[in-house]
Amino acid sequence: MIDTYRNNVSRKRTELSKLSSDRAKESAKKAQQKQKIISATNSINRTNSQSIIRSKRSEIERAEKEIASIDKKIADLDRKIAQKETEIANEEKKVRTEEDKIRKKQEQEDKKRQKDNEKTLKEINQAISMQQRMQFDMQKDID
């Protein structure tokens, strides 16, 4: 059972890594779109041509829409990342709980084994004492 929990943690960490990677890619896309806006704005400021200004404003509008779309994807990825982190924490808790169960079971087995060993040793010592008494009594009868 503990191996299942450990495998789940490993798998979920891999999934979390992929989500984080996807988020980084979306952030890079957002930076590119912001750069497009800056470039188009600079072009607008340098020109007097109305057609270029309209074209650059359309470019800015498309970039802003793309940024809004990217922000939505990033928010979704952030939600998934938070959910995955919660799942990992839950699986790690299961691992710790299972490890505690195994440790407690091992401790109980060790205590039982120790108790059995002490009982056996006591029985052996009693048998030796009885044997010594019998030997002493026999020696006494012989003398």
Language-model features and meaning:
Residues M1-E15:
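Short, charge-rich amphipathic alpha-helices with coiled-coil/heptad character
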Residues K73-D76, E118-D143:
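Domain-scale macromolecular recognition modules
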Residues D22-R62, E87-E98, I102:
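Extended alpha-helical coiled-coil "stalk/arm" regions
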Residues N7, S43-I44, S129, D143:
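Generic ordered-secondary-structure signal
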Residues V9, L16, D71-Q106:
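Long, charged amphipathic alpha-helices with heptad-repeat/coiled-coil character
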